[in-house]
C-alpha cells in the first residue's frame, strides 16, 4: 500500500539535511546512505547517492524521472546468476 497523501513522502531527515547543505554550497559529492525506504525528492536531482544493497553501496545518479520512487528500487539486493547448466556429469547420470 502507498503512503497517505496527507502525510506526504518520507525521506530520512539526515539524508535530506545533507542534500540541502550540498545544494546551498553547490557541491556534488557522493552521499552514502542505508535508507533504501527514502522517497526521491526534486531537491535530489543531479546528485549521486550510494545506496546500500546489503553488501556494498551502489552509486545511483538521480534524474528527473526517478522523482517519487524509492532509493531502494535502483539498488537491487539479489543478483541472479542463472539456472543450473548441463554438465558432462549430469548428462552421464541419465
UniProtKB/Swiss-Prot annotation:
Q: Name one GO molecular function term.
A: structural constituent of ribosome
Which protein are we looking at? Small ribosomal subunit protein uS19
Q: Which UniProt keywords apply?
A: Ribonucleoprotein, Ribosomal protein, RNA-binding, rRNA-binding
Q: Biological process GO terms, please?
A: ribosomal small subunit assembly; translation
- HAMAP family, per database record: Ribosomal_uS19
Q: Which PROSITE patterns match?
A: RIBOSOMAL_S19
Q: Which GO terms describe its cellular component?
A: cytoplasm; small ribosomal subunit
Which gene is this protein's source?
rpsS
Its biological function? Protein S19 forms a complex with S13 that binds strongly to the 16S ribosomal RNA.
Provide an example Pfam family for this protein.
Ribosomal_S19
| Keyword Signal listed | no
Stored Gene3D superfamilies: 30s Ribosomal Protein S19, Chain A
Q: Which family does it belong to?
A: Belongs to the universal ribosomal protein uS19 family.
